[in-house]
A protein has these predicted regions:
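A conserved FAD-binding loop/helix module that cradles the flavin
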Residues: 353-374
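FAD cofactor-binding and catalytic pocket of flavoenzymes
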Residues: 1, 119-259, 268, 313-316, ...
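Conserved redox-cofactor binding core of oxidoreductases
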Residues: 1-65, 71, 302
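Patatin-like phospholipase A catalytic core
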Residues: 1-29, 191-216, 222-226, 275-277, ...
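A glycine-rich dinucleotide-binding beta-alpha-beta segment and adjacent secondary-structure elements
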Residues: 54-67, 219-238, 242-243, 255, ...
Length: 381
């Protein structure tokens, strides 16, 4: 069921396309301004009586008792080689999905497999959000889509604005047996270049690299017999699979910590999702008379192959995933590492699955939830 807030937002946009509710729904992305945590919260952190911030203190080891049921200390090290040991009653590791994994695996003094890795699940089920170009829309009226779906940025906000797009309904996911997805319709590169050049000229600023930009635009446009108005970019959920994982290498970094190797692997369900989602979008665009979707050849192949241009959006997910038992994951429902009384993980590494949207909002929500849980436990003790 759609959030009533977004339903209300849609009511003010009377020109949204009337997708069949069993097929697609309109999506809305809002992009916040970049947040530099240290700059924004420095004064608050400095004045807090509950928080001590240590600079240049990189955690390089989690030490447990011999039975691996309790963390006894953390070892920290600076780039200059200074070391110290931190003791606490509870420990929360919140260094991002990749670093969370590296730290657990590298802390292998007691157990060669690392901390919290009794069942070998640390680093497994590494997920991202596959971003793929699925095709072009052929339309006799490209402006109709441009008016609806181009990304817009408020004046002076640079890249921070919003974009409209389409996404899966629960009904179509069940019907087609696919994961979640969303897609946005973006102008062809040539049109983007020409718009930038024209805006610069209107402002009496001769465009930089004029000849090369013009050449790129012309090459993109020449030979287009029909109106290829927009490229369609899809962002999908990735199915958790243990063949996609993070592992340590023999190489060391400046802190003498082992570097990691990312084995990001997509599977047949991921590819099936892209194919079926593309077909649904094409069917709906055709039914509404907006245009025809020219689907890329690779999308229609019944295999698990993705093009080399596929990327994950820098959304690292699932490497210390939440589970009911240690056999299926690394942390429990309270983000506590299975079998270790005082060790918790925060961040998108605990996500069992990642959906199709950026993870930051959920990361913050889970971090606040974890903070409340730990605070309640501290008060009780």
């Amino acid at each position: 069921m759609q959030n009533p807030i977004f339903t209300a937002a849609e009511s003010g946009l009377d020109n949204l396309l009337d997708y069949l509710p069993s097929k697609l729904e309109s999506m809305f992305w809002s992009f916040s301004t970049p947040t530099r945590f240290g700059q924004k919260y420095r004064a608050e952190l400095e004045s807090s009586s509950d928080v001590t911030v240590l600079m240049h203190a990189n955690v390089v080891d989690i030490t447990t008792n011999p039975s691996e049921t309790k963390v006894t200390s953390l070892k920290i090290r600076s780039l200059s080689g200074n070391e110290a040991v931190i003791n606490a009653s509870r420990y929360i590791i919140a260094t991002g999905a990749l670093e969370n994994t590296r730290l657990l695996l590298a802390s292998n003094t007691i157990n060669p497999a690392g901390v919290g890795n009794h069942s070998g699940m640390v680093g497994k089920n590494y997920q991202n959000h596959p971003h793929v170009d699925i095709g072009n829309i052929v339309s006799s009226d490209p402006q109709a889509l441009s008016a609806l779906y181009e990304r817009r940025a408020p004046s002076g906000q640079g890249d921070n604005g919003f974009r409209l797009g389409v996404g899966a309904t629960a009904a179509v996911q069940e019907e087609r047996e696919i994961l979640n997805f969303s897609a946005s319709f973006q102008e062809e590169e040539a049109k983007k270049i020409l718009k930038v050049m024209w805006n610069e000229i209107k402002s009496f600023n001769w465009p930089t690299d004029f000849s090369s930009k013009l050449k790129m635009a012309v090459e993109d446009l020449v030979g287009q017999e029909k109106r290829l108005s927009h490229q369609v970019y899809m962002y999908t959920e990735q199915a958790p699979n243990e063949d996609s994982y993070i592992a340590l290498t023999d190489q060391k970094d400046a802190l003498d910590m082992p570097r990691i190797n990312m084995h990001w692997k997509l599977n047949a369900l991921d590819k099936h999702t892209v194919k079926q989602a593309s077909l649904v979008i094409g069917e709906e665009l055709g039914r509404l008379g907006v245009g025809r979707l020219n689907i890329r050849d690779w999308v229609m192949q019944d295999d698990a192959k993705f093009p080399s241009s596929t990327w994950g959006g820098c959304h690292q997910i699932g490497t210390t995933r939440m589970s009911e038992s240690a056999e299926d994951g690394v942390v429990d429902g309270n983000c506590q590492v299975h079998g270790i009384d005082n060790l918790y993980m925060a961040g998108s590494s605990v996500f069992p699955t990642g959906g199709h949207t950026p993870p930051t909002f959920t990361i913050v929500a889970l971090a606040l939830r974890l903070a409340d849980h730990v605070a309640a436990g501290s008060s009780a003790s």
